[in-house]
């Protein structure tokens, strides 16, 4: 059994959340021992979503209107998958994404449809806007007010610059269970001050999340760029012919070529793991059967990345 989780990638400041990543690994590991791969993914991602330091669930970034629109997806190695985009007032979007996979014939539900689906299944209303999120919004609005133009124009002019320097705190988990089955899941609050209705890579299978018989992947970073490159699927398919780490490095090289800030975690069906970023630093942790406890690597940018 193997589990690896991530808490986002940043070119600048990253949250000190290694304790949460370790707890996510342990929660996922417990589920793996009792159930199957998809349960390990869901339980691990729920821990990450519940931490206000990370941009998912309770810590999700508000959009331009001050509303929190969240997205998530989950996928198994038999191509079963489900996702939600633009969902509001839900504590754990990853659980709704799993419900889409298991209880509908659809792959992706968005906006009001996703909200209605969640309520019909009994998911309780939950306000994910915590004190930390409010402070983040206040800082962004105050900075925008100092500009000569409107906040809308400010967003349009500064969005790409902001993307390159901010913490892109998508969270995700990838697992291999005791029966050799793989699964992956990704959850996010999107980009701080994004336009209402914007959807990134996280809920899109093949872009932010991917799993098949050879490997599984979860992405983080600049969603638009990840979508254009279809990175999760590429990395997943490359694992048929190389190690998980080699596949991730190949994906990051492609991202660098096109100027896309991103990171990835991956698990191959032989139990090998891979993680890396195109630039900046991605926070992650992993746990394998031959380890005493989860490890949260303290790698910094440009350090040597040997095969794992």
Enumerate the predicted regions with their spans.
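Alpha/propeptide regions of enzymes that mature by internal proteolysis
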Residues: 1-308
